[in-house]
Regions:
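Helix-to-loop junction immediately C-terminal to a conserved catalytic motif
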Residues: 48
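Catalytic Walker B motif of ABC-type/P-loop ATPase nucleotide-binding domains
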Residues: 156-160
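ABC ATPase C-loop
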Residues: 148-149
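The feature captures the beta-strand-to-loop junction immediately N-terminal to the Walker
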Residues: 33-35
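Conserved ABC transporter NBD signature motif
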Residues: 56-64, 76, 109-114
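ABC-type ATPase nucleotide-binding domains, specifically the catalytic core motifs of the NBD
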Residues: 12, 30, 68, 93-112, ...
Length: 234
């Protein structure tokens, strides 16, 4: 479904990614793990068109992502839930969800998509008239994910969905990821909580200093001495 080859990217004179090769197959959940500053968020921004790579190729179901304007990438079936959620805090849950249904296909199926989101996240139906900024961190994450799902994506990008949340809420967020997976959606998730994310993905990539250092199934990554020593405290 998603294919990155030899991707270099950065900010000004600073290079953040070096020769990234990454694949996500339809129906998979794939994790990207690594320390702060490794390039994980840059990777997500490159895929969603917020940053243009300096070199390499990105294809989504055969379509060239790099020749697609950023505001049209959602039409390819890619939806991005950014780190820290980026909701409109003074708008209601309903209005935030509407923001995700701006492409024509999503507008045509608005009621159907809204029902899908409310089935996944019943709490959002209860809170639909509440201002998003007054909800708990976990509820805001539900809303941010729901907004992305309103576009009817084929691939959902989740950037640090547990960031800044209390431990109990972190557990709830990963339960949300399991529900999304059960719906059949393909997921690429960036996460620092290595132990938790490896429980919900099929495969994972380890990025350090902008380079992929290791990759494998979740079981292989959990058994990797590199991962255990650096990220699992074993």
């Amino acid at each position: 479904m998603l294919e990155l080859r030899s991707v270099d990217a950065g900010y000004g004179s600073f290079q953040a990614l070096f020769g990234i090769d990454l694949d996500v197959k339809a129906g998979e959940a794939v994790g990207v793990i690594g320390p702060n500053g490794a390039g994980k968020t840059t990777l997500m921004r490159v895929i969603s068109g917020l940053i243009r790579p300096r070199r390499g190729s990105i294809r989504m179901e055969g379509a060239d992502v790099l020749t697609t304007p950023p505001h049209r990438i959602v039409n390819l079936g890619i939806a991005h839930v950014p780190e820290n959620r980026r909701l409109f805090p003074r708008l209601s849950v309903d209005d935030n969800l509407k923001m995700g249904a701006f492409i024509s296909d999503a507008r045509a199926k608005y009621a159907e998509r809204l029902e899908f989101v409310f089935d996944l996240f019943p709490r959002m139906k209860e809170r639909r008239s509440q201002m998003a900024g007054t909800m708990s961190g976990g509820e805001q994450q539900m809303c941010a994910i729901g907004r992305a799902l309103m576009s009817g994506p084929k691939l959902l990008l989740l950037d640090e969905p547990s960031a800044g949340l209390a431990p109990l809420v972190v557990q709830q967020v990963f339960e949300l990821v399991k529900r999304i997976r059960a719906s059949g959606l393909t997921v690429l998730i960036v996460e620092q909580n290595v132990q938790q994310v490896l429980k919900v993905v099929d495969r994972a990539y380890l990025i350090e200093a902008g380079t992929i250092r290791a990759s494998g199934t979740s079981a292989e990554m959990l058994a990797s001495s590199t991962v255990k020593e650096a990220y699992l405290g074993v």
